[in-house]
């Protein structure tokens, strides 16, 4: 008896799990490689103390330290090599650590701006602002803060240099750091 077309399919063993083939364009591969090379360049530009905060293995760390010593064409080749090393590693923890390093500076600037605004409110405001400062920083000495505010107002009225003005900011900065 002749085999039916349905029987021909049974002659070949069916794969239990078919793997999905993901097609990636050559341009996308190049973009990814370039992004990793830029990440490597950022790592090379970091100081030694900042590099210690980034999770790097020994090979990658050695390659980065070598790239920091090399100049010109050798440096370019070393950056290519660092990009190659990064392709074989999980770069997510590295990028997270770099973002934290970059954002730390932005967070400090934001904090300083908030403290400046608070200082200006203290000098222009009333006791409600002092209560707000005490709520933010419980270790604040009200009497010392009031004295600084009073002195700053006197200096401003007499057109003297803003010594107490700066002291209020420094006091608030110290309170923020100790909180």
UniProtKB/Swiss-Prot annotation:
Gene3D superfamilies in the cross-refs: PSPTO4464-like domains
GO molecular-function term, one example from the UniProt record: rRNA binding
Pfam family membership, one: DarP
GO cellular component: cytosol
Keyword set, alphabetical order: Cytoplasm, Ribosome biogenesis, RNA-binding, rRNA-binding
Any GO BP annotation: assembly of large subunit precursor of preribosome
Localization per record: Cytoplasm
Keyword RNA-binding: yes
Keyword rRNA-binding applies: yes
Reported function: Member of a network of 50S ribosomal subunit biogenesis factors which assembles along the 30S-50S interface, preventing incorrect 23S rRNA structures from forming. Promotes peptidyl transferase center (PTC) maturation.
Family to which the UniProt record says this protein belongs: Belongs to the DarP family.
NCBIfam families: PRK05255.1-1
Protein name: Dual-action ribosomal maturation protein DarP
